[in-house]
Amino acid sequence: MNNDSQQAAHEVDASGSLVSDKHRRRLSGSQKLIVGGVVLALSLSLIWLGGRQKKVNDNASPSTLIAANTKPFHPAPIEVPPDTPAVQEAVQPTVPQPPRGEPERMSHGRKKHRFLHIAVAIKGSASAPVRATWAEDKKTSVTTTPCRMRSVRRERFVDTYETHRAAAQQGTLLPHPDFMVTQGTIIPCILQTAIDTNLAGYVKCVLPQDIRGTTNNIVLLDRGTTVVGEIQRGLQQGDERVFVLWDRAETPDHAMISLTSPSADELGRPGLPGSVDSHFWQRFSGAMLLSAVQGAFQAASTYAGSSGGGMSFNSFQNNGEQTTETALKATINIPPTLKKNQGDTVSIFVARDLDFFGVYQLRLTGGAARGRNRRS
């Protein structure tokens, strides 16, 4: 009796399902997620493979039969440019004329010697037409010998050296060394305004110490002198420093001087470093979206081509890709931004001599002045 009841309990349902037990095993949430991911990956792989297979089929060219070449190979004849009259006049006295019965194999050597004499004649001649003609022959001639190339390089080096060679410079004395800040002086400065390179603009800094003249006797720029600079442009891709041009300095006593000097860091390196924001997600999120949209268009084009509607969908695909590229181009080309905090130390690299002779005057003070008055 009991066996009959157990057998009835485990009998197959009338619907024919073999898994009719109500205590069957269920999939957990993580297992469902894994299965869904696998299915999604397989679907994307099939779409990508289908698009790639179509691209390969479109790019494949029909195989052609190559007929065997039964004719012997003959090299192309060497074209020798005609000699100019000026070159011929310089070459004719030095080129030996071979006898008429000389074999044909000597023609190549005769051409080589002729090129050597042409190079020597051009090197010794200073006329511009000969040089221009030789340059044209160099462009058109195929048989350029190593000797001729060395002559060209030597000629160019001599011309460049003679053009850029500077005359001898004479030493001079500074007219007012006590009142001058010479070129190359590095002046420290503390930023009063923060820097953000999103837009061009002006910056301001204050000198934390006195700046003296060349003799280190007279203070020319007092502590607290304000300096105004200009940021002319922002950063480009790959830049990590911003260029600031310092325009003018004003002392607490209202003495002003034009600097026109570039910025530098504490060690004198050009430009100012800072915190650089490359806008990675803003730039590459658009790139990833563009790639996804193009992949979707390619997959849809493959499907439409296989179903017979490829002609109409290809035009839609091209228009969609152009619209997407136009919309996302500005997002992908976002330039980086450099930010520098207020209070950071920067440097001013003096680019020219600063003369304060017309601003300050020297006079004797203290004991020196009293001694002079006694002598007088």
Swiss-Prot record:
Ranges in a coiled coil: none
Principal location: membrane
CDD domains: VirB10 (cd16429)
Name of the molecule in the record: Protein virB10
Gene name per UniProt: virB10
Family in the record: Belongs to the TrbI/VirB10 family.
InterPro entries: T4SS_VirB10/PtlG (IPR047695), T4SS_VirB10/TraB/TrbI (IPR005498), T4SS_VirB10/TrbI (IPR042217)
Domain of life: Bacteria
Keyword Cell inner membrane in record: yes
CC terms in the record's Gene Ontology section: plasma membrane
Membrane spanning stretches: 33-50
Record key words, sorted: Cell inner membrane, Cell membrane, Crown gall tumor, Membrane, Plasmid, Transmembrane, Transmembrane helix
Lineage start: Bacteria, Pseudomonadati, Pseudomonadota, Alphaproteobacteria, Hyphomicrobiales
Localization of this protein: Cell inner membrane
Mode of membrane association: Single-pass membrane protein
Biological function: VirB proteins are suggested to act at the bacterial surface and there play an important role in directing T-DNA transfer to plant cells.
